[in-house]
Regions:
Chain A
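Conserved N-terminal beta1-alpha1 strand-loop-helix module at the mouth
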Residues: 1-75, 116, 124-134, 201-202
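Conserved, mostly hydrophobic/aromatic
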Residues: 10, 43, 80, 140, ...
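Active-site-adjacent beta->alpha loops and helix N-cap segments on the catalytic face
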Residues: 16-23, 42-52, 68-78, 93-108, ...
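Structural motif
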Residues: 33, 83, 112, 132, ...
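Short, conserved beta-strand edge motifs with alternating hydrophobic and charged residues
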Residues: 41, 117-120, 138-140, 174
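Residue-level detector of anion-binding/catalytic polar loops
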Residues: 57, 86, 115, 135, ...
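Glycine-rich phosphate-binding active-site loops on the catalytic face of alpha/beta enzymes
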Residues: 86-97, 136-149, 189-209
Length: 217, 217, 217, 217
């Protein structure tokens, strides 16, 4: 099985505005060359620009569980979809939501036919998130985020535990992923792919970093 | 003096995506015809699309007090500026921020040369917001939002009190504004303009509503 | 089976300070007379006063998922336990928590041997909350809170759906409960009891209201 | 002038429950012996126990800007006052509030005759907080909290700047305070006293730490 690579652009200088477009282009090329699906997750303000120029799945970093109405400053599913987004992260560790909001965000995204990835921090919250019926859950142990130590190596039990707790909902794993062998390990532990950020976006050559990531396939 | 009209698109169906573009076009025409400055405030995901197509000042509905870095799902000043935004609301009643965040958001926006409008709910918070040195404060008594009763009529003392409390920082007023006479009253009470939303966005003919709004000038 | 009555004091004048003590006394008498377990849930600042004077299970309205440390203004499990609390609500509709916080709060409470009741708003979040393994989940459809219309009558399917989704975790239901027949209906729908507030605390005679509540047993 | 010492108990094991009572007793003795006013700020659940047993001003760590009503899990001014609290921190760095909430909390506290201390993180937010007319502002530069480096030494300009920005509202300073000379420096920079926590609560002998703190007077 080919893994899914979800590349979170966060708010790094290297992945904002023009740089975001460039990074998305690199991701598209690597995806085309390798046959691996790479999803790019730019800042919300950059979604339209990227989806307009590049044929690659673009996801949002956040969505709110709202409907049309008076919700200044919030992120509306229908607006994301119209701008070209095809999915969204929900409850990322840097943008946690209340339990009822996670559910409402997941439902709002589905209403607009957006694929949903609910992020979680441990096995218990993975079980809870999976019970809300998203398309994916993505487990990222907070102590490993940005550590450079891949979760698949540091704590394989949390990954296999998450896969079991998800009861059939597809699982991604994140935190510390930067090499092809990390992706391979993630797949071998039962996940469908990885969620990563700085390992690629802040690499000296992001395209090369992506190529290395998919090289094992 | 000509008033400033700040038109908040919120997340209404009538002001999302294609509809947002259409509404911005109407605003541009009314602004050109009347000589009144109209600022449009679409959802963040719609900023690029509008600023790319229409010559009109576009502001964001929200900004976070962050710098480049790991801030998934947050709104970065530099990303807004690159996408064409020229200013931003801060602390809107539907997206309130912590005190330290209001300050940080105001500083982040200035760093990217974005004009700042801090929203407030009463005279005391207007005084506090103005002391942070934004370009504007916008007072909106929460009990009047969406009421159809203009703050300039229902509670003129809160407007004059806000102007006094702002100590030279320019003041906008909002809540219940929908007619030219409301704008006129706001100016006579010492403000520089108005912040409004549903009175225009949900009007049967938004362009006509904008024309009526600027007709008294 | 005898139902469990959980009486949330909220922050009403009728259930603050001396009034809280009086209400807890009434609850104790009704519990003794009827053999029904009544749990009182006063404000956190009133827990010590009540637990010191009255032999009745006292729960907290909120707990934070923290450990000993620098957490000014937060609610620590061990401090609640030392003050006499024997359990706690988590994620009440008026004090919603992030998903990871619900999990952490539930774990913190267990660490201090406090019984946990996670509050939820619909079937999906009940399933998610139950998967975190609390002692109870309490479903309260937000549209019925304070309505005077009992959830057991207005929407029995949401109650039976919650009982099924909870997969063996005990379920309470709330919103609109004020009479003995509401409690009876709740039990017949498969719950272990009810969570209620204003139906008793704001009754002309709270003791009589409690007596009516347990009269059907 | 004699300084004001505000001792935040946070949620440390050393200052919870029975330990909180013991620490408050030590504070009382040092206050009596030295003539310096020491205010103790225990966890909310410990306020009643301490105020019942010891004659010392007890403040809350947090208060919500609410009135009597349905506010489960929130902190009500009148309940604090009935339990013996005589003042409260507002917007502590570990429990930040939205701007409108800071104002509402300050007003709620005044309504119940509680002395208010609004905490701030820099000169700008000190100016904003002071404009809300609390009894005190307490500036704590976040980078120095728990550092052991007293703000009065590391950054005296931020203290004098805060005193100036407060325009007559009394100022406390915090972060890194642990010795008598830090208190002395704080007073010389124009403040009325200090807000401190771990320097005393986690000292091997808290009473001795407090004696050292007031020794310079």
């Amino acid at each position: 099985m080919k893994p899914l690579i979800v590349l979170n652009f966060k708010t790094y200088a290297e992945s904002t505005g023009e740089n975001a477009l460039r990074l998305a282009m690199a991701a598209k090329q690597v995806a085309s060359d390798s046959g691996v699906t790479i999803i790019v997750v730019p800042q919300i303000v950059d979604i339209f620009y990227i989806s307009q120029h590049i044929e690659i799945p673009v996801y949002a970093q956040h969505i709110d569980g709202i409907e049309f109405g008076g919700h200044t400053g919030h992120v509306l599913a229908e607006a994301l979809a119209q701008a070209g987004a095809r999915g969204t992260l929900i409850n990322h560790s840097e943008r946690r939501l209340k339990l009822a909001e996670v559910d409402a965000a997941n439902e709002a995204a589905k209403r607009a036919h957006l694929t949903t990835i609910i992020c979680t921090n441990n096995i218990a919250t993975t079980r809870a998130a999976a019970s809300l019926n998203p398309d994916f859950v993505a487990i990222e142990p907070p102590e490993l985020i940005g550590s450079g130590i891949p979760v698949s190596k540091a704590n394989p039990e949390v990954v296999t535990g998450a896969v079991e707790a998800a009861k059939g909902i597809k699982v991604l794993c994140g935190a510390g992923i930067s090499k092809g062998e990390d992706v391979k390990a993630a797949i071998e532990l039962g996940t469908d792919g990885v969620l990563l950020a700085s390992g690629v976006t802040k690499a000296p050559d992001p395209k090369e970093a992506l190529q290395n990531l998919v090289a094992f396939v």
